[in-house]
Protein backbone atom coordinates (compact mmCIF):
# COMPACT_ATOMS: atom_id res chain seq x y z
CA UNK A 1 0.00 0.00 0.00
CA UNK A 2 1.37 3.40 -1.00
CA UNK A 3 1.95 5.66 2.00
CA UNK A 4 2.19 9.42 1.57
CA UNK A 5 2.56 12.04 4.36
CA UNK A 6 1.27 9.56 6.94
CA UNK A 7 -1.77 8.39 4.95
CA UNK A 8 -2.29 5.01 3.28
CA UNK A 9 -3.56 5.62 -0.25
CA UNK A 10 -6.27 3.17 -1.42
CA UNK A 11 -4.57 0.82 -3.89
CA UNK A 12 -7.43 0.31 -6.35
CA UNK A 13 -8.38 3.96 -6.89
CA UNK A 14 -7.03 6.32 -9.55
CA UNK A 15 -4.35 8.70 -8.24
CA UNK A 16 -6.59 11.71 -8.84
CA UNK A 17 -9.01 10.28 -6.24
CA UNK A 18 -6.51 8.48 -4.01
CA UNK A 19 -4.62 11.72 -3.25
CA UNK A 20 -7.82 13.27 -1.86
CA UNK A 21 -7.57 10.89 1.12
CA UNK A 22 -4.86 13.26 2.41
CA UNK A 23 -6.37 16.00 4.62
CA UNK A 24 -5.85 19.30 2.80
CA UNK A 25 -5.72 17.80 -0.71
CA UNK A 26 -8.91 17.97 -2.78
CA UNK A 27 -9.52 17.17 -6.44
CA UNK A 28 -7.99 20.42 -7.72
CA UNK A 29 -4.84 20.14 -5.63
CA UNK A 30 -4.48 16.47 -6.57
CA UNK A 31 -4.62 17.35 -10.27
CA UNK A 32 -2.16 20.24 -9.79
CA UNK A 33 0.26 17.92 -7.98
CA UNK A 34 0.02 15.23 -10.66
CA UNK A 35 0.52 17.79 -13.44
CA UNK A 36 3.56 19.28 -11.68
CA UNK A 37 5.16 15.86 -11.18
CA UNK A 38 4.21 14.60 -14.65
CA UNK A 39 2.29 11.56 -13.40
CA UNK A 40 -0.93 10.49 -15.14
CA UNK A 41 -4.11 11.01 -13.07
CA UNK A 42 -5.48 7.77 -14.56
CA UNK A 43 -2.71 5.68 -13.01
CA UNK A 44 -3.73 3.48 -10.06
CA UNK A 45 -2.06 3.91 -6.68
CA UNK A 46 -0.85 0.29 -6.76
CA UNK A 47 1.10 1.02 -9.98
CA UNK A 48 3.20 3.85 -8.47
CA UNK A 49 6.95 3.35 -8.53
CA UNK A 50 9.12 4.32 -5.57
CA UNK A 51 10.55 7.20 -7.62
CA UNK A 52 7.06 8.58 -8.34
CA UNK A 53 6.12 8.26 -4.66
CA UNK A 54 9.20 10.30 -3.71
CA UNK A 55 8.28 12.93 -6.33
CA UNK A 56 4.72 13.20 -5.00
CA UNK A 57 5.87 13.34 -1.37
CA UNK A 58 8.42 16.08 -2.10
CA UNK A 59 5.93 18.18 -4.08
CA UNK A 60 3.17 17.92 -1.46
CA UNK A 61 5.46 18.57 1.53
CA UNK A 62 7.17 21.59 -0.03
CA UNK A 63 4.12 23.30 -1.57
CA UNK A 64 1.17 22.54 0.70
CA UNK A 65 0.24 22.39 4.36
CA UNK A 66 -1.42 19.02 4.89
CA UNK A 67 -2.52 16.57 7.58
CA UNK A 68 -1.28 17.40 11.12
CA UNK A 69 0.16 20.84 10.30
CA UNK A 70 -3.08 21.95 8.64
CA UNK A 71 -5.26 20.52 11.43
CA UNK A 72 -3.15 22.36 14.04
CA UNK A 73 -3.38 25.62 12.08
CA UNK A 74 -7.18 25.38 11.76
CA UNK A 75 -7.53 24.57 15.49
CA UNK A 76 -5.25 27.51 16.36
CA UNK A 77 -7.33 29.85 14.17
CA UNK A 78 -10.53 28.78 15.93
CA UNK A 79 -8.88 29.10 19.36
CA UNK A 80 -7.70 32.62 18.48
CA UNK A 81 -11.19 33.68 17.39
CA UNK A 82 -12.66 32.34 20.63
CA UNK A 83 -10.03 34.18 22.71
CA UNK A 84 -10.49 37.57 21.05
CA UNK A 85 -14.27 37.23 21.35
CA UNK A 86 -15.16 38.06 17.77
CA UNK A 87 -18.56 37.03 16.38
CA UNK A 88 -17.23 33.81 14.86
CA UNK A 89 -15.46 32.95 18.12
CA UNK A 90 -18.66 33.44 20.11
CA UNK A 91 -20.54 31.16 17.69
CA UNK A 92 -17.83 28.51 18.10
CA UNK A 93 -18.00 28.81 21.89
CA UNK A 94 -21.79 28.40 21.90
CA UNK A 95 -21.72 25.51 19.43
CA UNK A 96 -23.83 27.34 16.85
CA UNK A 97 -23.33 27.66 13.07
CA UNK A 98 -20.53 30.13 12.34
CA UNK A 99 -21.13 31.10 8.72
CA UNK A 100 -24.52 32.79 8.84
CA UNK A 101 -26.82 29.79 8.52
CA UNK A 102 -30.30 30.00 10.01
CA UNK A 103 -30.92 28.54 13.47
CA UNK A 104 -34.65 29.01 14.00
CA UNK A 105 -35.08 25.65 12.33
CA UNK A 106 -32.42 23.18 11.23
CA UNK A 107 -28.77 23.53 12.39
CA UNK A 108 -29.25 20.22 14.22
CA UNK A 109 -25.84 18.81 13.33
CA UNK A 110 -24.14 21.80 14.98
CA UNK A 111 -26.54 22.17 17.93
CA UNK A 112 -26.96 18.47 18.68
CA UNK A 113 -30.22 16.59 19.29
CA UNK A 114 -33.35 18.50 20.33
CA UNK A 115 -33.78 19.28 24.00
CA UNK A 116 -37.49 19.28 24.69
CA UNK A 117 -38.72 22.15 26.86
CA UNK A 118 -41.74 21.50 29.10
CA UNK A 119 -44.60 23.85 28.34
CA UNK A 120 -48.16 24.57 29.43
CA UNK A 121 -50.60 21.71 28.93
CA UNK A 122 -53.60 22.44 26.75
CA UNK A 123 -56.91 22.10 28.58
CA UNK A 124 -58.79 18.95 27.50
CA UNK A 125 -62.15 19.07 25.70
CA UNK A 126 -65.30 17.87 27.44
Curated annotation (Swiss-Prot):
<dbReference type="InterPro" id="IPR001892">
    <property type="entry name" value="Ribosomal_uS13"/>
</dbReference>
<dbReference type="InterPro" id="IPR018269">
    <property type="entry name" value="Ribosomal_uS13_CS"/>
</dbReference>
<protein>
    <recommendedName>
        <fullName>Small ribosomal subunit protein uS13</fullName>
    </recommendedName>
</protein>
<feature type="region of interest" description="Disordered">
    <location>
        <begin position="95"/>
        <end position="126"/>
    </location>
</feature>
<dbReference type="InterPro" id="IPR010979">
    <property type="entry name" value="Ribosomal_uS13-like_H2TH"/>
</dbReference>
<keyword id="KW-0687">Ribonucleoprotein</keyword>
<dbReference type="GO" id="GO:0005829">
    <property type="term" value="C:cytosol"/>
</dbReference>
<keyword id="KW-0699">rRNA-binding</keyword>
<dbReference type="GO" id="GO:0019843">
    <property type="term" value="F:rRNA binding"/>
</dbReference>
<dbReference type="GO" id="GO:0015935">
    <property type="term" value="C:small ribosomal subunit"/>
</dbReference>
<keyword id="KW-0694">RNA-binding</keyword>
<dbReference type="InterPro" id="IPR027437">
    <property type="entry name" value="Rbsml_uS13_C"/>
</dbReference>
<dbReference type="Pfam" id="PF00416">
    <property type="entry name" value="Ribosomal_S13"/>
</dbReference>
<comment type="similarity">
    <text>Belongs to the universal ribosomal protein uS13 family.</text>
</comment>
<dbReference type="GO" id="GO:0006412">
    <property type="term" value="P:translation"/>
</dbReference>
<dbReference type="GO" id="GO:0003735">
    <property type="term" value="F:structural constituent of ribosome"/>
</dbReference>
<keyword id="KW-0820">tRNA-binding</keyword>
<keyword id="KW-0689">Ribosomal protein</keyword>
<dbReference type="InterPro" id="IPR019980">
    <property type="entry name" value="Ribosomal_uS13_bac-type"/>
</dbReference>
<dbReference type="GO" id="GO:0000049">
    <property type="term" value="F:tRNA binding"/>
</dbReference>
<comment type="function">
    <text>Located at the top of the head of the 30S subunit, it contacts several helices of the 16S rRNA. In the 70S ribosome it contacts the 23S rRNA (bridge B1a) and protein L5 of the 50S subunit (bridge B1b), connecting the 2 subunits; these bridges are implicated in subunit movement. Contacts the tRNAs in the A and P-sites.</text>
</comment>
<comment type="subunit">
    <text>Part of the 30S ribosomal subunit. Forms a loose heterodimer with protein S19. Forms two bridges to the 50S subunit in the 70S ribosome.</text>
</comment>
